[in-house]
Amino acid sequence: MKWVVSILLIFLLNSTESRTMHSNAYGIASALDSFQCSPEMNLVDLATIFFAQFVQEATYKEVSKMVKDVLTVTEKSTGSEQPTGCSENRLSAFLEEICHEEEIPEKYGLSGCCSQNEEERHNCLLARKKDSPASIPPFQVPEPVTSCKAYEENREMFLNRYLYEIARRHPFLYSSTALYLASHYDKIISACCKSENAVECFQSKAATITKELRETSLLNQHVCAVIRNFGPRTLQAITVTTLSQRYSKANFTEIQKLVLDVAHAHEECCRGNVEECVQDGEKLISYVCSQEDILSSSIVECCKLPTVELAQCIIHAENDDKPEGLSPNLNRLLGERDFNQFSSKEKDLFMARFTYEYSRRHTKLAVPVILRVAKGYQEFLEKCSQSENPLECQDKGEEELQKYIQEGQALAKRSCGLFQKLGDYYLQNAFLVAYTKKAPQLTPPELIALTRKMATAAATCCQLSEDKQLACGEQVAGLIIGQLCIRHEESPINPGVGQCCTSSYANRRPCFSSLVVDETYVPPPFSDDKFIFHKDLCQAQGVALQTMKQQFLINLVKQKPQITEEQLEAVIADFSGLLEKCCQGQGQEVCFSEEGPQLISKTRAALGV
């Protein structure tokens, strides 16, 4: 699945150094150091993506004007000797264009950002990005007649408008990904406009690209949040893990080099440096293909594809198998050395080497699980250093680390057991009760959306073979929890959620699993308005009826977060009885008005609220 294999996109180092310093600081040659601008780069499209993502509410006309103005200025400043599309760094010029005329900053509330210096201005504008803002309606694919006419009249403008529409709704989407999706959209429009049934063609194919856009955008947003909140050390561990699993036959030095380069590329993408994001991506893909013999045989076929398909093929390639001949455990990786005698830098390098060795031996494990193993191993080594016989203690490390895998396996088994027993809807309700207790400050729609994702993940992962369920579940849970943490970052939920989100990336999921009830939450005074029942409960069907029932469940738990399972079952049984009684007769509204208050009185007495 995409979210599993595309976790390759999470990488290292919050660095703003030039490429030369990026290379020299680590003593490792970089594939990105030779800056050669691509004459084929479409700067109009890239600038459109930039302005649409940084000024999301700007109209297409306003964005087009900014694009025209800034490219006129930058083309003059670069001179005529350089090929079209060649500039060391247009990012500053793009940022200046947003602020240099008063109309845009004043109209869209950017004056505060624009009053700051260059770096602070950039960070301020980045912080204003909002994924799928409420003020912008969801993108709808235009009906075929209109689309095909516009496409035939001016294909370039049609696709540029598409880039504007998706970029403003998905401000964290990498520019390289946006261009890929636009090329995909181009093929869909071209094919469907020639189809006998254009409407059906548009509906089916547009649904596919919309799903891909949504998933990729969420993944890119997750990566940028990791870079923003956890910094170099955590990201280094994630990167080493991912690349060591992907290219398990590659040596440690090659992995280190690739980590640094990919890190720099992702940093630039997250900063909104649309031009460098694309160029770095192209150079990385070229480098990986030039090293296919060293890295992996699995990318050989990918490297024969055209550029656009090539990148997607490499990103979505499966992890290599564990190399033959590796020692079964890593107990003696330290040899006769005492971990606590290492300097801080030596400890970091050793842990990177341990993570590399462990990951290439466990290519099927989820990245978060290996991160917990590495974190636990470092704590174990530090503990051994305090013992009477450190070397003897260190030899028991492999056995000590099994508990992290076993904890995850037990949770996966328990979750899939519940899914098999309850099915999607009732499993979602179980998640709903649990997360309403953990985060009662979330609104009912937020809780329903969050737990629906969890239930969908269970439905997907639990269909896999048992050996794949853990990795699947951990990866999806990491992304879902990541979205919850982004929500907390924008508007704090409660201290417990904040602690889980910020204390340790590796331990996020176990932290949320162990979180039970928000002890700081004070239930609001009981309100009858939240528990008034009407005949629409009898008329609703499918998802609409399920949502009504779930809202009742949420309001109930919010009123009494300490509600026991037995109390909950009793109230649900009474509620089901009410529906059965009132929905069978003719006077449904009268029945609810008479029986509903009695149910609520009984419930309040039983719960003491």
UniProtKB/Swiss-Prot annotation:
Signal peptide bounds: 1-18
Principal subcellular localization: secreted
Matches recorded under Gene3D superfamilies: 1.10.246.10
Keyword Repeat in record: yes
Claim: Glycoprotein is one of the keywords in the record: yes
Glycosylation sites: 251
UniProt record similarity statement: Belongs to the ALB/AFP/VDB family.
Assembly and binders: Dimeric and trimeric forms have been found in addition to the monomeric form.
Listed name of the protein: Alpha-fetoprotein
Protein source organism: Equus caballus (Horse)
Biological classification of the source: Eukaryota, Metazoa, Chordata, Craniata, Vertebrata
Gene: AFP
